[in-house]
Swiss-Prot record:
Lineage: Eukaryota, Metazoa, Ecdysozoa, Arthropoda, Hexapoda
Organism whose genome encodes this protein: Drosophila melanogaster
Gene label: Taf5
Claim: Membrane is one of the keywords in the record: no
Renumbered residue ranges of the record's region Disordered: 287-336
Residue ranges of WD repeats: 376-405, 448-478, 490-520, 532-562, 574-604, 616-646
UniProt feature, compositional bias: Basic and acidic residues: 314-324
GO cellular component terms listed in the entry, alphabetical order: nucleus; transcription factor TFIID complex
Biological role: TFIID is a multimeric protein complex that plays a central role in mediating promoter responses to various activators and repressors. May play a role in helping to anchor Taf4 within the TFIID complex. May be involved in transducing signals from various transcriptional regulators to the RNA polymerase II transcription machinery.
Domain of life (superkingdom): Eukaryota
Subcellular location, record wording: Nucleus
InterPro entries linked to this entry: G-protein_beta_WD-40_rep (IPR020472), TFIID_NTD2 (IPR007582), TFIID_NTD2_sf (IPR037264), WD40/YVTN_repeat-like_dom_sf (IPR015943), WD40_repeat_CS (IPR019775), WD40_repeat_dom_sf (IPR036322), WD40_rpt (IPR001680)
GO annotation, biological process: transcription initiation at RNA polymerase II promoter
Protein name: Transcription initiation factor TFIID subunit 5
Assembly behavior: Belongs to the TFIID complex which is composed of TATA binding protein (Tbp) and a number of TBP-associated factors (Tafs). Interacts with Tbp and Taf4.
Record-linked CDD domains: TAF5_NTD2 (cd08044), WD40 (cd00200)
């Protein structure tokens, strides 16, 4: 409690007596409750005598208390029902700030919507009357200018006029822009402009248009006309032209990289070097070659010659040394976990199994096995198969994770501590002896999330599992104790995807909060936060060398991030819908992305260019994967179809002819590269996985 006593000995006499009376009543109340130290201190500070205090009656105290309590109630009421001058003071400040922000959309007080519409109409006529060689590039300016004029009309309060303007001219635009325009038409108040993601993004970054120098010169000459001043102002504030020398692009080439909310990527977005090569593998020969025995001393020189011992033969599979890749990062570029002996043995086993791999081609397609989840009343939201193809994990809408064994071996749990102490730790099969045979089960459930599970991911060593959920958390599960060992919190919205690094230890997640985050299993804080997407990040994937992470977003872009610096080193545009799936090629140079727009795009990470677009699916492409030898690309989606593409021919044509967006082939990619299509029986695909021997495993959900 604080007490103001500075006016006791001065000021107005009436006010003095009133204040002193209240003070005496307070002292009387303190004395009543026997707060002696407080009473003495206050009497000394206020210079009050005991005689003055004795003159105050109990009724005086009650009267003052009633007045104080009444004033408190009045103050509380005034907080809810304030006077017109004060009641909306805070909201007035907010409205003033909003008005100031909205004023940015309108250049002057004499705003004339008709003037802007007439300017756009003339621009549209100019584009239509242009020569065919320039028309397609010039038409790319219509969408961003149309949207900016709509913002200005809506900010001026003319909602119906703004809606009428969009409805009148939206037919000029390509179909992939209609979805964005439909969302903008839902804006009903000028203030909603300040909260819309697309509006904020277009205010912060300029819309990028790639255009030949000749096309750009024609456009500049047109907007220099006095009647085009309003268009020229929009162009200078909100558009960025990335010009190049050479012929203007045709319709196909313009559409190939269009579709993003902020246009195409700038050249400087893809200029940084990317070390896409693979890291040098460990020398496995040292794991299998026994240590040389110490040489015996030859004491008797006259003794007959002893037979020489034969040197053990080297395994030709293991003696192959991997060549150093000039495009690979240094082994210490990012700190990678040191391989334990058990990890090396797992890699050795994988290498031996890979030696029996089937070489795939158009004449020798992979065999495919389809796992169908039946009677899943909880709803299957995701599925993942372990790298050694022995386990299947599925996430469900009821927040559970369920794991099945795909082999006769059952899922066993760790023995108790007393039994573990009795084991010989030097035993070669210690990993098997640690598990209790009596606890074996075909399937196990993991409970802990409080929302639908959107992704599961096995660790490379197959003893850990990651899961992410709508509850904004990521959980790390032990597949030895079948329990949650860590809960990672950092995202503030649902987490859509999570992936382990190929070398283990690190993992990456992405969320509705427009970010992706890099984590380490031994830290509950994110190591890197990748910020740059304009909408939620839907999918994520680790590069085979663990130095980079790819993300796909609802802003229709694909980005590549450097784990060491946290910077975006590639920005790739071309999708016409949210990016739903990603996969790196076995060599690390290429990235495939699937989308809600039904398309699959192949990207070259060396320069960020679009290699080709694969058109065959009729619905969202939910999952993509490459064969282990990198020759076949498998894709599947909600259209219940599995497609196999000749990726070897894609790269062969690209390298030999260097087909780029500027020189796009006229042939139908479906006819050239599609190897085979396999339909499922009313079962959308959830996951695809190639085994080490190139057997294709599919997981789907049967819809009755």
């Amino acid at each position: 409690m604080s007490l103001e006593v500075s006016n006791i000995n001065g000021g107005n006499g009436t006010q003095l007596s009133h204040d002193k009376r209240e003070l005496l009543c307070l002292l009387k109340l303190i004395k009543k409750y026997q707060l002696k130290s407080t009473e003495e201190l206050l009497c000394q500070e206020a210079n009050v005598s005991s005689v003055e205090l004795s003159e105050i009656s109990e009724s005086d105290v009650q009267q003052v208390l009633g007045a104080v309590l009444g004033a408190g109630d009045a103050n509380r009421e005034r907080k809810h029902v304030q006077s017109p001058a004060q009641g909306h003071k805070q909201s007035a400040v907010t409205e003033a700030n909003a008005a100031e922000e909205l004023a940015k959309f309108i250049d002057d007080d004499s705003f004339d919507a008709q003037h802007y519409e007439q300017a756009y109409k003339e621009l549209r006529t100019f584009v239509e009357d242009s020569l065919d060689i320039y028309k397609h590039e010039l038409s790319m300016v219509l969408y961003p200018i149309l949207v900016q004029i709509y913002f200005k009309i809506l900010a001026s309060g003319l909602r119906e006029k703004a809606k009428e303007f969009i409805e009148k001219y939206k037919c000029d635009l390509d179909g992939y822009y209609i979805e964005g325009l439909f969302n903008l038409l839902l804006l009903s108040k000028p203030e909603e402009l300040l909260e819309n993601d697309l509006v904020v993004a277009m205010e912060q970054d300029k819309f990028v248009i790639r255009m030949s120098r000749d096309s750009h010169s024609l456009f500049k000459r047109h907007i220099q006309d006095r009647r085009q001043e309003v268009v020229a102002d929009i162009v200078s504030k909100y558009l960025h032209f990335d010009t190049y020398e050479g012929m203007a692009r045709n319709k196909l080439q313009c559409v190939a990289t269009a579709g993003s909310h902020l246009g195409e990527a700038k050249r400087q977005d893809n200029k940084m070097r990317v070390y896409y090569g693979l890291l040098k593998e460990v020398d496995f020969q040292t794991l299998t070659t026994p240590a040389p025995a110490p040489e015996e001393e030859d004491d008797d020189p006259d003794a007959p010659d002893r037979p020489k011992k034969k040197k053990p033969k080297k395994d030709p599979l293991l003696s192959k040394k991997s060549k150093s890749d000039p495009n690979a990062p240094s082994i210490d570029r990012i700190p990678l976990p040191e391989l334990k002996d058990s990890d090396k043995l797992l890699k050795l086993k994988a290498l031996r199994e890979a030696s029996k791999r089937l070489a795939l081609s158009k004449d020798q397609l992979p065999s495919a096995v389809f796992y169908t989840v039946l009677n899943s009343h909880q709803g299957v939201t995701c599925a993942e198969i372990s790298d050694d193809s022995t386990m299947l994990a599925c996430g469900f809408g009821d927040s559970s994770v369920r794991i099945w064994s795909l082999t006769p071996a059952k899922l066993r749990t760790l023995k108790d501590a007393d039994s573990l102490r009795e084991l010989d730790k030097e035993s070669a099969d210690i990993n098997v002896r640690m598990l209790d045979d009596r606890s074996g089960e075909v399937t196990r459930s993991l409970m802990g999330h409080t929302g639908p599970v959107y992704r599961c991911a096995f660790a490379p060593e197959m003893n850990l599992l990651l899961s992410c959920s709508e509850d904004s958390t990521i959980r790390l599960w032990s597949l030895l104790t079948w329990s949650c060992v860590v809960t990672y919190r950092g995202h503030v919205y649902p987490v859509w995807d999570v992936r382990f690094a190929p070398h283990g230890y690190y993992f990456v997640s992405c969320s509705y909060d427009k970010t992706a985050r890099l984590w380490a299993t031994d830290s509950n804080q994110a190591l890197r936060v990748f910020v740059g997407h304009l909408s939620d990040v839907d999918c994520v994937q680790f590069h085979p060398n663990s130095n980079y992470v790819a993300t796909g977003s609802s802003d229709r872009t694909v980005r590549l991030w450097d784990n060491m610096t946290g910077q975006s080193v590639r920005l790739m545009t071309g999708h016409k819908g949210s990016v739903s799936s990603l996969a790196f090629s076995a060599c690390g140079r290429y990235l495939a992305s699937g989308s809600v727009d039904h398309n699959i795009i192949i990207w070259d990470l060396s320069n960020g260019s679009l290699v080709t677009t694969l058109l065959r699916h009729t619905s969202t492409v939910t999952t993509i994967t490459f064969s282990r030898d990198g020759t076949v690309l498998a894709a599947a989606g909600l259209d219940n179809n599995l497609t196999l593409w000749d990726f070897h021919k894609v790269t062969e044509d690209y390298i030999s002819n260097h087909i780029t967006v500027s020189h796009h082939q006229d042939e139908n990619d479906e006819d050239v590269y599609l190897m085979r299509t396999f339909p499922s029986k009313n079962s959308p695909f959830v996951s695809l996985h190639f085994t080490r021997r190139n057997l294709l495993m599919c997981v789907g959900l049967f819809k009755s």
